[in-house]
Amino acid sequence: MNTKGKVVGVNGNLVTIEVEGSVSMNEVLFVKTAGRNLKAEVIRIRGNEVDAQVFELTKGISVGDLVEFTDKLLTVELGPGLLTQVYDGLQNPLPELAIQCGFFLERGVYLRPLNKDKKWNFKKTSKVGDIVIAGDFLGFVIEGTVHHQIMIPFYKRDSYKIVEIVSDGDYSIDEQIAVIEDDSGMRHNITMSFHWPVKVPITNYKERLIPSEPMLTQTRIIDTFFPVAKGGTFCIPGPFGAGKTVLQQVTSRNADVDVVIIAACGERAGEVVETLKEFPELMDPKTGKSLMDRTCIICNTSSMPVAAREASVYTAITIGEYYRQMGLDILLLADSTSRWAQAMREMSGRLEEIPGEEAFPAYLESVIASFYERAGIVVLNNGDIGSVTVGGSVSPAGGNFEEPVTQATLKVVGAFHGLTRERSDARKFPAISPLESWSKYKGVIDQKKTEYARSFLVKGNEINQMMKVVGEEGISNDDFLIYLKSELLDSCYLQQNSFDSIDAAVSSERQNYMFDIVYNILKTNFEFSDKLQARDFINELRQNLLDMNLSSFKDHKFNKLEHALGELINFKKVI
């Protein structure tokens, strides 16, 4: 029989409950008020009193309201039908909620995440008599562009023998597709879906590998200078309006992955609506179909209850780990982890815990680390390799990278793509600072070349600061040429037009080709009589390179521009 209790105190979305019976941490419970059941989660136990965070608005909850505990942790349902869906943080399908409740979400309405009536064409890959363990494949269904493997549930701890398996055909997620038997002779029915607690990492794999293979984003500044590896982690901190959301959307569109999961936790509703409107209309460059076919969106806007933000981050990473277990490459984009940290700060304050820096909880670093540590590249039991790459945007107030959430994130990620107000105001997009950003991963271009090019950016910035004080006349022609070359590298290679059909996504082959051209310009010595002549020449080169960026790779126009560029360089270079 489930444990019962009653409300003895309410403080915002924190409810204190007096319980009669046993309760466990993170257990889900329902507060019964005004004819509705409001979902909540146990976050602290003190004797016979329990503190729970409610995932809904707590308006109307009063002392004496009855509470029922479920004896279950907060879980997600895993199975075919997750892709193309838009969920809230508790995995309620928002399109279904809209049909049922209208434009405004009602409290206490919880729907099943997966469609129980839809039939999936199941093709078996195992047979009666096979010995299986948790995470092994029984067969697959086609979900959008993905071979969705039907697996033995991850919570099964022993080895089992398949005693029954259905023939190929159409089945719903609740229909029995196999029966497995353990060593004691007990039989277990297997369906296409099962539940898994969101705060428990999925560990049904043979070993974890060190991320080394680059995950191509087709954004030049990232792939060349600050690469991300498959199974790696990266963060995108930046002030408001610097282009974090656009950069994440471009990455999700062009990244070399099989499935994209977007966790919009605490973002403005307008940005989430933009994502929901754009994604179904965008074409996946790899398949020619809608981008939504390989995307799952979990959104908790800033207007939704605070507690559900935390749940949305864990829901997203659990779904990512589930698809990783199929041997797929997953990209999870969390936008923005600052809002999630603010939700933790709010709960910590209500629990009257000793605050850390800027009133964030003292355990902020360990919570952020435990989230990013769930990224990784793994070898599955059958030898396949799957990965989850995690990218979190951070919204520090005023673009201050010294604040606690950014600092806690920097300690655990493998790449840092810092967006700056200075670059976004100058309309240099993506506004990733080439001087402040870094990456620990290997990119698509030789590291010696990129370090040489980056040294030009550093020198160019120093000369630019000097020119602000003494003017152009106060520096030598050689220094002025270094400054012009650094500006050429910035405008022709680091900057990219996300709204141009050709320049929005640049293949690794084209990146190598264009970088070699720019690298040769940086290495070449030129001689000019004065600064005006130098500026005119570099501007001519810049225009030529920009035109090449907007031309199809190696077509007639591209080749013509490249030939003209070569003649210009040969005309002015010092032999």
From Swiss-Prot:
EC number(s) given by UniProt: 7.1.2.2
Pfam families, per the entry: ATP-synt_ab (PF00006), ATP-synt_ab_N (PF02874), ATP-synt_ab_Xtn (PF16886), ATP-synt_VA_C (PF22919)
Enzyme class, UniProt record, top EC level: translocase
UniProt cross-references to InterPro entries, sorted A to Z: ATP-synt_VA_C, ATP-synth_a_Xtn, ATP_synth_asu-like_sf, ATPase_F1/V1/A1_a/bsu_N, ATPase_F1/V1/A1_a/bsu_N_sf, ATPase_F1/V1/A1_a/bsu_nucl-bd, ATPase_F1/V1_b/a_C, P-loop_NTPase
Catalytic activity: ATP + H2O + 4 H(+)(in) = ADP + phosphate + 5 H(+)(out)
Binding site for ATP: 238-245
An individual GO BP term: proton motive force-driven plasma membrane ATP synthesis
Highest taxon above the source species: Bacteria
MF GO annotations: ATP binding; proton-transporting ATP synthase activity, rotational mechanism; proton-transporting ATPase activity, rotational mechanism
GO annotations of cellular component type: proton-transporting ATP synthase complex
Keywords: ATP synthesis, ATP-binding, Hydrogen ion transport, Ion transport, Nucleotide-binding, Translocase, Transport
Role according to the record: Produces ATP from ADP in the presence of a proton gradient across the membrane. The V-type alpha chain is a catalytic subunit.
Family of this protein: Belongs to the ATPase alpha/beta chains family.
NCBIfam families associated with the record: PRK04192.1 (NF003220)
Protein name, entry field: V-type ATP synthase alpha chain
Source organism: Borreliella burgdorferi (strain ATCC 35210 / DSM 4680 / CIP 102532 / B31) (Borrelia burgdorferi)
